[in-house]
């Protein structure tokens, strides 16, 4: 099984890098885990709607270029469906049972994801109505993917 994150921007904070590295190490016994970073589009403060649309379109094209046809894609979106950790674990298990060995999660930049990226996604997932920095979301998502594997294994990690 392959789990891939396609994310906008680089991770700068050492503490996020360390947390993700720890969960990536733990995930290595269950899957091949990778993170593909696409450059964020530089944009000035106080963007007009047209400038926001341009920035999102550029980032969206970069994201879509990193997704293969065979990949099952989750887009992280505030308007996506919320799931419990148990329901998410069952989804991952069901996807593998039904032949989806390549699962990709997309985390957009500060302006979100374009309609084209959301359309390409097989499903949209939300971690609630909070707005979180995409760097933090990367760590939270990595932990939740690890938790899903632990739930499916029957491990006491998920209490």
From Swiss-Prot:
Main location: cytoplasm
Binding-site list for S-adenosyl-L-methionine: 76, 108
EC number: 2.1.1.177
Keywords annotated in UniProt: Cytoplasm, Methyltransferase, rRNA processing, S-adenosyl-L-methionine, Transferase
Location(s), subcellular: Cytoplasm
Catalytic activity: pseudouridine(1915) in 23S rRNA + S-adenosyl-L-methionine = N(3)-methylpseudouridine(1915) in 23S rRNA + S-adenosyl-L-homocysteine + H(+)
Top-level class of the enzyme under EC nomenclature: transferase
Gene3D superfamilies: 3.40.1280.10
Coiled coil location: none
CDD domains registered for this protein in UniProt: RlmH-like
GO CC annotation terms, alphabetical: cytoplasm
Residues annotated as signal peptide: none
Annotated InterPro entries: Alpha/beta_knot_MTases, RlmH-like, tRNA_m1G_MTases_N
Gene Ontology molecular function: rRNA (pseudouridine-N3-)-methyltransferase activity
UniProt function note: Specifically methylates the pseudouridine at position 1915 (m3Psi1915) in 23S rRNA.
Assigned protein family: Belongs to the RNA methyltransferase RlmH family.
Subunit and partners: Homodimer.
Alphabetized PANTHER family for the sequence: METHYLTRANSFERASE (PTHR33603), RIBOSOMAL RNA LARGE SUBUNIT METHYLTRANSFERASE H (PTHR33603:SF1)
Stated name of the protein: Ribosomal RNA large subunit methyltransferase H
Organism: Levilactobacillus brevis (strain ATCC 367 / BCRC 12310 / CIP 105137 / JCM 1170 / LMG 11437 / NCIMB 947 / NCTC 947) (Lactobacillus brevis)
The encoding gene: rlmH
């Amino acid at each position: 099984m392959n789990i891939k994150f396609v994310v906008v921007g680089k991770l700068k904070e050492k503490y996020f890098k360390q947390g993700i590295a720890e969960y990536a190490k733990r995930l290595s016994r269950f899957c091949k885990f990778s993170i593909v970073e696409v450059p964020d589009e530089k944009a000035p403060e106080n963007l007009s709607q047209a400038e926001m649309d341009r920035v999102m379109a550029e980032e969206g094209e970069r994201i879509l270029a990193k997704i293969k046809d065979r990949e099952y894609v989750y887009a992280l979106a505030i308007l996506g469906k919320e799931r419990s950790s148990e329901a998410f674990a069952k989804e991952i298990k069901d996807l593998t049972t039904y032949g989806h060995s390549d699962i990709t999660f997309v985390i957009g930049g500060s302006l979100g994801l374009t309609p084209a990226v959301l359309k390409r996604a097989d499903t949209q997932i939300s971690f609630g109505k909070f707005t979180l920095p995409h760097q933090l979301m990367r760590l939270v998502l990595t932990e939740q993917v690890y938790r899903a594997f632990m739930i499916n294994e029957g491990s006491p990690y998920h209490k």
